[in-house]
Amino acid sequence: MLKMESTQQMVISVINTSFEAAVVAATSTLELMGIQYDYNEVFTRVKSKFDYVMDDSGVKNNLLGKAITIDQALNGKLGSAIRNRNWMTDSKTVAKLDEDVNKLRMILSSKGIDQKMRVLNACFSVKRIPGKSSSIIKCTRLMKDKIERGEVEVDDSYVDEKMEIDTIDWKFRYDQLEKRFESLKQRVNEKYNTWVQKAKKVNENMYSLQNVISQQQNQIADLQQYRNKLETDLQGKFSSLVSSVEWYLRSMELPDDVKTDIEQQLNSIDLINSINAIDDIESLIRNLIQDYDRTFLMLKGLLKQCNYEYTYE
């Protein structure tokens, strides 16, 4: 069995070797670029891409198919070789054509153009009709050959469903939007009116507070003026009091030293500060009462020495 499939085994070996070469080329490139990599991750990614490109492009099946044809020819089964003699000329031409086709297939697969897209593009073409939006779909000779070979099947699972077009009731949509707009407009107006009322109330309170402050300031000014007047009147009264007492003192028959002492106490009264003036007058009165008390005690003692008695009337 191994001898009969020797060509197939050789092709599989070449494909596997190509994969290993792709992995080595990828890792070597990353090392030359100074990029750190995980070998297992690179191996997995390259294998996934390599298997996809080889399978989707048909290169693997093409190589294995030719290997099977060669093995069958070596084993005396020349049917496949005879069927391919129409396009086989010589080994170099076939090898070159296969190389170019396989290269193109792999490039298309790597670009995301899979087998289904390539087959459909090869089987059909589109012809545009000048002046019209419609077009004509043409079958290529490959499609004709596939029909003749029975390689075209009808997919009964496909159901021609009628495309439903959603009809939009624009009037209903407009009415809905208009209602939403009116509702939003009403809410905005309500909030605005509420804000206006609050602003008016704040302004009224502010004006009322300003009036109260103004009235209080006027009252304070009046009280200050009245206080100044009282202060002036008191200063005048104290000055008149001092002058009157001095005049009355001079009319008394008291000794000069007593008059001088009392005048000094009168002149020491602070006539500018009313509170200090009251304190000074209080001190003067206390001193006078104290002097009167001493004089009375002296008189009382003198009466006792003279054996006199005294009474208050």
Swiss-Prot record:
The lineage of its organism: Viruses, Riboviria, Orthornavirae, Duplornaviricota, Resentoviricetes. One of its GO terms (biological process) is regulation of translation. Belongs to the rotavirus NSP3 family. Homodimer. Interacts (via the coiled-coil region) with host ZC3H7B (via LD motif). Interacts with host EIF4G1. It is found in: Host cytoplasm. Residues 1-149 are annotated as: RNA-binding. Residues 166-237 form a coiled coil. HAMAP family: ROTA_A_NSP3, ROTA_NSP3. Gene3D superfamilies: 3.30.70.1610, Nonstructural RNA-binding protein, Rotavirus non-structural protein NSP3, N-terminal domain. Residues 170-234 are annotated as: Interaction with host ZC3H7B. GO terms for molecular function: RNA binding. Keywords: Coiled coil, Host cytoplasm, Host-virus interaction, RNA-binding, Translation regulation. Residues 208-313 are annotated as: Interaction with host EIF4G1. GO terms for cellular component: host cell cytoplasm. It comes from Rotavirus A (isolate RVA/Human/United States/WI61/1983/G9P1A[8]). Plays an important role in stimulating the translation of viral mRNAs. These mRNAs are capped but not polyadenylated, instead terminating in a conserved sequence 'GACC' at the 3' that is recognized by NSP3, which competes with host PABPC1 for EIF4G1 binding. The interaction between NSP3 and host EIF4G1 stabilizes the EIF4E-EIF4G1 interaction, thereby facilitating the initiation of capped mRNA translation. Residues 150-206 are annotated as: Dimerization. This is Non-structural protein 3.
